């Protein structure tokens, strides 16, 4: 299945719909919710499925999609638990390193893979396990774990950049998995010709605003991190996206209207002597 069609991604269409913002938001959200509900219904009807693997690049909407999937599954009589692969990071001091000595948090080997296998084995065999939580402020796994106990016909949603990587999935029973890949898969065009915002830049704008509002990151810090983020996606995600059973386009056309003022304001703050000035002006 590929849920990517029937999207009018012309700038002129967006500008027209923006005149009725509430209706535009409802239209975009409705489209995405229907996709999630269709998938949830199919999962609920297939009793063999016990684990949903949900992968996507940075700012594709993994956490939001996992939340919506849980809600949609519940409507279909199936409870679920969400597990983030980010909580299986090795402590920063144990992380793999680039040749210059800086930590490589994008590689799949930045995760404690044997521990992930152990947790998933416990869930599948006993129905319960202690789930770790990673503290990104300290760069360490928290001492406290979250205990989960699943009942019959409950589903685990594992979300993360590496959720489709065979290194992560090879120890899991393939006949009990359902794999989802999400990404912004539409560009914004001017009259169907010139690209005014490509797919990767759309995700960057999402991340730029998110990191500023919720993580206290400057524009330059986000631009600096984006270099390694892109490396991680190109190396550890995109080669495995075709392993998915379903691919979903997570673009919400109204978001360009919502994010533009904050994004432009932030990008204008980059000084002319910055190494990121040219890129900020382009965006």
For the regions a language model picked out, list residue spans one by one:
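Charged, amphipathic alpha-helical linker segments immediately N-terminal to NTP-binding catalytic cores
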Residues: 1-38
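P-loop (Walker A) phosphate-binding loop of NTP-binding proteins
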Residues: 57
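Conserved nucleotide-sensing/catalytic segment adjacent to the nucleotide-binding pocket
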Residues: 81-83, 90-139, 155
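Conserved NTP phosphate-binding and transfer environment spanning the P-loop NTPase/kinase superfamily
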Residues: 21, 33, 170-283
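Hydrophobic anchor at the beta1->P-loop junction of P-loop NTPases
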Residues: 52-54
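Conserved glycine(s) of the Walker
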Residues: 61
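Hydrophobic positions on the alpha1 helix immediately C-terminal to the Walker A/P-loop
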Residues: 64-69, 84
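Post-Walker A helix-loop "phosphate-sensing" segment adjacent to the P-loop in P-loop NTPases
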Residues: 71-81
């Amino acid at each position: 299945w590929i849920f990517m069609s029937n999207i009018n991604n012309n700038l002129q269409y967006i500008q027209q719909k923006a005149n009725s913002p509430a209706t535009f938001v409802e239209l975009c959200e409705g489209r995405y919710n229907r996709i999630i509900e269709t998938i949830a219904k199919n999962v609920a009807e297939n009793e063999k499925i016990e684990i949903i693997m949900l992968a996507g690049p940075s700012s594709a909407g993994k956490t939001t999609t996992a939340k919506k999937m849980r809600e949609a599954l519940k409507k279909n009589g199936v409870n679920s638990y969400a597990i983030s692969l980010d909580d299986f990071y090795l402590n920063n001091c144990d992380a793999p390193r680039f040749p210059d000595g800086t930590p490589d948090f994008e590689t799949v080997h930045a995760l404690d893979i044997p521990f992930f296998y152990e947790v998933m084995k416990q869930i599948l065999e006993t129905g319960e396990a202690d789930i770790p939580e990673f503290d990104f402020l300290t760069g360490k796994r928290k001492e406290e774990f979250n205990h989960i106990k699943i009942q019959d016909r409950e589903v685990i949603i594992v979300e993360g950049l590496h959720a489709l990587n065979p290194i992560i999935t090879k120890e899991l029973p393939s006949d009990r998995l359902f794999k989802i890949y999400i990404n912004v898969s539409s560009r914004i065009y001017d009259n169907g010709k010139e690209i005014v915002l490509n797919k990767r830049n759309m995700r960057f704008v999402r991340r730029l605003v998110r990191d500023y509002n919720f993580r206290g990151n400057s524009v330059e810090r986000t631009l600096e991190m984006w270099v390694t983020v892109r490396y991680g996606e190109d190396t550890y995600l995109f080669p495995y996206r075709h392993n998915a059973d379903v691919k979903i386009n997570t673009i919400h056309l109204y978001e360009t209207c919502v994010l533009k003022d904050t994004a432009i304001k932030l990008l204008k703050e980059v000084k002319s002597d910055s190494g990121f000035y040219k890129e900020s002006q382009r965006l």
